């Protein structure tokens, strides 16, 4: 009897633990799916092939395949360190010099909206955080519609950002997989049918994931139909300067819409064009009817931000602000960002040239027609799978590659592999 009682006492904690697990507050929580891009990176890391290529990651690499910190960023960091600045909280709306410089960069120094002060810009946590602030603002104050129309396809994070803010997602045609180019006719048809006073999201430049941008004449037609339908245009500008190498050219569409009197909101990121990926520097801007309205909007944006994260991070904003507001650093940045854009453009040209040398009979012109970091190659999922298994070349299943991950030393290998799986 004593032995039995002893065993019962010993087993009691185990039964209690099992019961606790079964009745856990979180027992209903299912394992979520892995991030598709991070999954590509993990598989790449496990590969032992010396020729392996990771074309999934959305970060710039130099021609040696190494991560790159801009010289102007290094100089700005040194200047900040020398000043021995404090680590106090930033204001809720962010670093004032940074937000003003961000607005000037996006809108242009001669912009009527900028010069008249009929805008408000708040600092956000890079592009994602700025988009989320914007989404929450629209959810609370845009009373006309809950619908946000995204191009098909769009950046994968757009859907959860707007959905989790309580908005509803719709789509308009954008990319034609048959031609690997813009479905302009489809886009115009769909946008012309969007209910009035809805929200339409537009990629200002270097559309992610396709790399397909409208031409300026097409942007004019798009602006015309957006204005006719009385839509609110939400511009996502994550690549200003990084697309064409020209900050003004990359902001042309945004500025044209504003000049046409279209209501616009904007999210910016400095992850790509300044290489400040981990610093999380970004901004959200609302173009208003006058300066008084801008003050009211700013007051509500600060009320929204306060329970989200209270104050934005300091370091990235200081770096970006110093670069944008210091003539010598700004000049150096413009040269460096053009250098990054030019290298990507060169890799596109070299890839097509090497495909021709391989004897490929396919038309690869879309690779050079597209712009920015990403390229929709037109490769099918089974071809992508072969590239991974046979050549250790990693990319997302939709055939999107980060051209920034291609270098002079391996562009020939990539072309050879693509030819082998497409011939």
Curated annotation (Swiss-Prot):
Q: How is this protein annotated for GO cellular component?
A: mitochondrial matrix; mitochondrion
* Residues engaged in binding substrate: 58, 155, 208, 400
- List localization entries: Mitochondrion matrix
Q: What class of enzyme is it?
A: transferase
Query: What is the required cofactor set for this protein?
Result: pyridoxal 5'-phosphate
Q: Which UniProt keywords apply?
A: Aminotransferase, Mitochondrion, Pyridoxal phosphate, Transferase, Transit peptide
Where is it expressed, tissue-wise? Detected in heart (at protein level).
One GO term under biological process is: aspartate metabolic process
EC number(s) on record? 2.6.1.1, 2.6.1.7
Q: What is this protein called?
A: Aspartate aminotransferase, mitochondrial
From the broadest rank down, the organism's phylogenetic lineage runs: Eukaryota, Metazoa, Chordata, Craniata, Vertebrata
